[in-house]
Amino acid sequence: MKRVVIAGTSSMVGKTTISTGIMKALSKKNNVQPYKIGPDYIDPTYHTEATKNKSRNLDSFFMDEMQVRSIFKRHSKNKDINVIEGVRGLYEGISPYNDVGSTASVSKTLNAPVILLMDARSLTRSAAAIIKGFKSFDTELNIKGVIFNKIRGEGHLNKLKEAVKYYDNDIEIIGAIPRDDGLSVSQRHLGLVPTPENKQKLLERIDLWGNTVEECLDIEKIVELSDESFDFEVDEKNKEETLWKVEKNNSKIAVAFDESFNFYYWDNFDALEENGAKIKFFSPLNDVEVPDCDTIYLGGGYPELFSEKLSNNKSMIDSIRNFDGKIYGECGGLMYLTNSIDGKEMLKLIDADAVMTPNVQGLSYVKGTFEKDCIIGEKSKEFKAHEFHYSKLININENDFSYRINRGKGIINSMDGITSKDGDIVGGYAHQHCIGNPYFAANLSKT
């Protein structure tokens, strides 16, 4: 299984731009399977557009080593090469004392060659020191190459090459990307702008990234390095049941998917389908009513940017308010379930109001415990998730909660998962993953 990790020396060095460009360039001749390390749900949408294969998350906080390998192996079948974008800097994880949640952790678990990506502005000899430090910090890692980003010109690149090769003749210099503001992509408070927004413009940008990578990097060298991968074993007993609970249910789940709601882990959909669910996508922004279903799944996104249009779609609001099945909303979906977002009327199914703030309100890996059986979990079971939001809930009237947050923030007083009296509606800030919460899919797919 050919595989390679594109790892940054830090955040903001151009990982998504260049990783997506590599995926796009390789896809012209190869069937490329993309991955994102960490809990990000926006970057994978860029990978998916570049390769036409759904990008998957690999995360050593949500998953143990065997689960990381199992997820990788099930999606790498019949693929020519697997390209894995890292998270933050190579060694950043949840702790300063170990590599859990880091790019390094997943790279070692997969025995994958690593290509370092470095912002080389104003660097020459220091680049050699950075590479030497990264290689010596953990000798179990297989750091094979380096890409320089934002170089000034050919003279700058030649000095970089001379310095790096003088101190480390084994490192492969894959190439360099010039400084060009035209290669950048718009960002906002939760990260990159998701691909469902202004999709045509973003597709043109991805084409530009792919063409730039072809011109500036040695693509064949990347393929050659990926061919040096060591194989690894996956326990044949480690089937889906050890990734997530599987019950043969028979339900229809309507998933909100449009410009306002698109933060999802695609493996969650696989897990739901393996539990017998039939998934239908719909748009709270543009559709008239929710499709025929047993359960509504409202994922995260940017409902605050589309609050007026959401509020004005009265037929959809009435359709969801009158729905008599189960409804699960997380983060943006939770906001939609409340009385209002910044004063714009919403579903009024959870008695609270969502307001945006200038500062991050929750940004953390999450550990939690279910206080009761609910539509996404089982009493006393623990789960791992992720939260990242600038909104908060106010005017929280008497509400019941289904889970306690032991690491992270939740909605209020370390509680999350506001639950309706009949238990059919749950809304929380934690983004659930089907491996971090192995009961998620089995419970949500029940009729």
Curated annotation (Swiss-Prot):
PROSITE patterns: GATASE_COBBQ. GO terms for biological process: cobalamin biosynthetic process; methanogenesis. Residues 252-439 form the GATase cobBQ-type domain. Pathway: Cofactor biosynthesis; adenosylcobalamin biosynthesis; cob(II)yrinate a,c-diamide from sirohydrochlorin (anaerobic route): step 10/10. GO terms for molecular function: ATP binding; cobyrinic acid a,c-diamide synthase activity. Its EC number is 6.3.5.11, 6.3.5.12. The active site is at C331 (nucleophile). Its cofactor is Mg(2+). It comes from the Archaea. Catalyzes the ATP-dependent amidation of the two carboxylate groups at positions a and c of cobyrinate, using either L-glutamine or ammonia as the nitrogen source. Involved in the biosynthesis of the unique nickel-containing tetrapyrrole coenzyme F430, the prosthetic group of methyl-coenzyme M reductase (MCR), which plays a key role in methanogenesis and anaerobic methane oxidation. Catalyzes the ATP-dependent amidation of the two carboxylate groups at positions a and c of Ni-sirohydrochlorin, using L-glutamine or ammonia as the nitrogen source. PANTHER family: COBYRINATE A,C-DIAMIDE SYNTHASE. This is Cobyrinate a,c-diamide synthase. It comes from Methanococcus maripaludis (strain C5 / ATCC BAA-1333).
